[in-house]
Amino acid sequence: FSVCLVYLFAGTGGENRTLRLVLSGMIIGSFFSSMVSFAKYVADPQDELPSITYWLLGSLKNMSWTLLLSGAGWILTGIVILLLFRWKLDALMLSEEEVKSFGISVHGFRFMTVAASSAITAAVVSMCGQIGWIGLLIPHFCRMIYGGSNKDVIPSSIVYGALFLLITDTASRCITASEIPAAILTSLIGAPLFLILLAKNGGLRG
């Protein structure tokens, strides 16, 4: 829903569309963040507020087969779309005129890939909360190993991302007597690892 609002406010053409997309995303994101804050403010501090806070931290603690099946359709559909059309994502790195010469509708394809990615993200977040850094760290790691082609990066990111989450979730259950939310551990591990990747690629050199 938020993605549709961003595209609606950004428009479909004209100058500075990228800037409008970024600004629209910031505005919509800020609005929904304030709605979450309002929900926390009016929530029952004894019962509802801890559940909201724990969900925002991100964890696999409450996962079940029933919950997984409720979002599996969206996740699998999004993954299939990205895998089937991943070669077209490489074409988007070319100029718009060159992309059109391949018979690809630039705006339509971009919207389709964003919609597929958003469906996956929304389904996952609804089940286990906001677990960050995986979507930022793992694709960069895969690009270092397999190169820049999305033909290899997308499938490997899916596999390595799942393995990374399983490892961090297992560690979060074993480090202390009470389970640490997985998002805390992914941030503690992901932030320094991402800095190392930047340093290896020369991103921190002057």
Language model features with spans:
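Alpha-helical transmembrane segments in inner-membrane proteins
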Residues: F1-G206
